[in-house]
Amino acid sequence: MVSLGGKFSDSGDTNMAGYSGTPLAKKIGIKEGSRIALVNAPKDFQFEPKELPDNVKFVKPPAKSLDIILFFVTTERALTKDFSKLAARLTANGMIWIAWPKKSSGVATDLSFERVQRIGLDAGLVDVKICAVDDTWSGLKFVYRLKDRPSVNKK
């Protein structure tokens, strides 16, 4: 499968993703008790401990019953290969965030909003939110449609 990355910082600087001033943890919907997997996160990616709610648990795939997956990806091929496998690890009300490089980032990619959206929709999920993860990465949130949620693995 894909590798894990990312870290936590205790530097005291809050990761204010994008331009809204809202901490990333809040933007992507991390709540108390969430089970989260960071997949292919860049080595310099971090959440500040003070922005995380209590009892958040970071786990490694192939863990199941995940509330949030944040998947960093640079190629359409990798996204197509791993999207459905990762989405199958979600709880019925879980979400998968796909993070791909912004055009302005200088990071090589063949992904765009339209390609990311198409792959997610083709996998049976629906996109419901977009955000700036940071100065390099855009993120698109996918969830299962309400009518499909009873058939998804539950906690």
PLM region descriptions:
Residues 12-49, 55:
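N-terminal, charge-rich interaction modules
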Residues 83-92:
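A short glycine-rich, Lys/Arg-flanked "PGG" loop and its adjoining helix->strand segment in the class I
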Residues 77-83:
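A short, conserved alpha-helix within the catalytic core of class I
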